[in-house]
Amino acid sequence: MSHNTFGHLFRVTTFGESHGVALGCVVDGCPPGLALEADEIQAELDRRKPGQSRFTTQRREPDQVKILSGVFSDDRTGGRQLTTGTPIALMIENTDQRSKDYSEIRDSYRPGHADFTYDAKYGIRDYRGGGRSSARETAARVAAGAVARKVIPGITIRAALVQMGPHAIDRTNWDWEQVGQNPFFCPDAKAAALYETYLDEIRKDGSSVGAVIEVVAEGVPPGLGAPIYGKLDADLAAAMMSINAVKGVEIGDGFAAAALRGEDNADEMRAGNDGRPRFLANHAGGILGGISSGEPVVVRFAVKPTSSILTPRQSVNRDGAEIDLITKGRHDPCVGIRAVPVAEAMMACVLADHTLRHRGQNGERP
């Protein structure tokens, strides 16, 4: 299996399966001399780990990260653990697998999952929890994102769940402080209360629901990205689309821009106090011509409902026989909830990569 690595200069390779011994990542290209401790990575993993509320899978994984390489400390570093510029290997052990839950689907294809497509491509698949196609893999991305944030300390990255099923938040109630105060990473307290009742009903029905996640990066300097095939928004779209269950991505106003007139969509400018243009709007989501404008970079993506549900679905098995299939196991009723910290991590990795690429071509400008 190839294509387990992304990035150009800040490169992340993830490894592992849902029910394997461990999963993790190797981060290559991180500059030397950056302070990096395991507890900083752990803080990000703790936001994503399962079993923290009744609204996520009840699989209970501590997700304890181990730094295997790429850091060093002694008296000359003042006791601080610093990156050395060599590959940083991070490992997270799996401790709460229940593979027996999946024995009945060994030769069956779960609707909406990658069972059939993995079989069609490789002729073999790890059916236990979805193997490599499981959202469990995203724990490694979150770990890598914690390293990426060290490369871009001046950039603030935050994400939130802004829609669950048909219920979108009221944007006039947006409060970033609320994101950490409810189990949905929701910036609207009223919407979070609604989601609690709504998702309880979904869970009782043995069903699932989709979501929309919005991730915002502030403090991004103008100039990151490149024309045509190195566009910042193209790389961000690819990064977000690579997250499990994501089926659509938009930048800035995205698809809503199609309904606007040109004068409504224009990000007009006036002279700023720092000698740079001051934008009067940000319909473009902080990216123009594939290059960052200095405005907040705004990305949204849609997450489909979790495919594993408790009502019978029509399918077939490897022999071509038609079957009715109920998916057992422990699953998220809304996988979009735990996609929030994953979105931040992917934004961080892409921006770290583009920061290093920009420096390589243009020095420290901007």
From Swiss-Prot:
GO MF, one example: FMN binding
Residues binding NADP(+), per UniProt: R48, R54
InterPro entries: Chorismate_synth, Chorismate_synth_AroC_sf, Chorismate_synthase_CS
Superkingdom, taxonomy of origin: Bacteria
GO biological process entries: amino acid biosynthetic process; aromatic amino acid family biosynthetic process; chorismate biosynthetic process
Pfam families, alphabetized: Chorismate_synt
Residues annotated to bind FMN: R132, S133, S134, N244, A245, G289, K304, P305, T306, S307, S308, R330
NCBIfam families hit by this protein: aroC, PRK05382.1
UniProt record similarity statement: Belongs to the chorismate synthase family.
Name of the protein in question: Chorismate synthase
Organism for this UniProt entry: Methylorubrum extorquens (strain PA1)
